[in-house]
């Protein structure tokens, strides 16, 4: 691909309070030793500034009734843009898909993805995931929710999957992932597709059981943690789910990545130790056999983030044409808190020295996302809530405002735009994607609109 246009999709929605502390105590587990040094300070690396290349955003969709806090985007090999967004009317949340074939200048009429009305959990922390097949297939997964008074925060979530065989013009009836297995709540899910059309999902799993009153409650006899499942027939059937790790932060995002060489990666925030001194650092587990088996967790960096709670942010990943794994993440470690970027050239067995993206004495927990274009240029986008956070110095992703910045990594240098691309305070950045000369970014802001902006590179 010749990188010609950078496309930004901005889903601008009313800010909603979505986070709360989830204090837990989890025993430590073994982890593969780390081989790199701690991150260097920001001023010690080359950071080149550039002007913001993005045009003013234009509106794709508008909601006046309720927030739609978790949009998502993907781009086809032909440059067609697919934008998912949620809309809530009369307390019923549904997912809609719009597409564009002219680089975002115009979009199709919306198609509702979920056939069962209101079968969607409204959660700005976790966007519905969309992936594309090679023959007009569109795959979407999300979580639904029902009231269960004995479960954490009173809700029980299931993982829902659907597919379209006509390029998103219509969708099939959805299925529940793991419906034939023992009951468990599924949270902070993510889905990837590999080069052969294999579908890979991972999530945080909370085993549950029915009690004598007819309500669900935690099942303490089974391990909670990160679980994984795959489908090798385009979502017609899914394998039995498998436990990847039992010592995961119970409310930080899980991320996946897969390529056409049999490599599948899962990242999550793992808990080491217990009590007030426990550490919650980002790790990656790797499979080189298409998801049949996975390595033990490897720390991306030995951050040593001591925190007995959840920051609600994960470590998104992308794989370039040479098979290098690229990852970005947030840490609240006292001596180097902020957002970082690193790579692995040995299938996740070790990681490079982290490159600081945003650091400071206080960096609120915010999201960072990553994509790689067809020229293997790395694109990063992140929220910067410095001075805007309503969380003060609480390590959690919560109800705050943020500015959205972008950068590229070229030949080891960070080329960062000097100005944010959003016109208003953003809320809940959810994805970045690239293909066919386009790079698309989606996030939420404060006026309930879905917008798009384009910049030529």
Predicted feature locations:
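Positively charged n-region of N-terminal signal peptides that target proteins for export
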Residues: 1-4
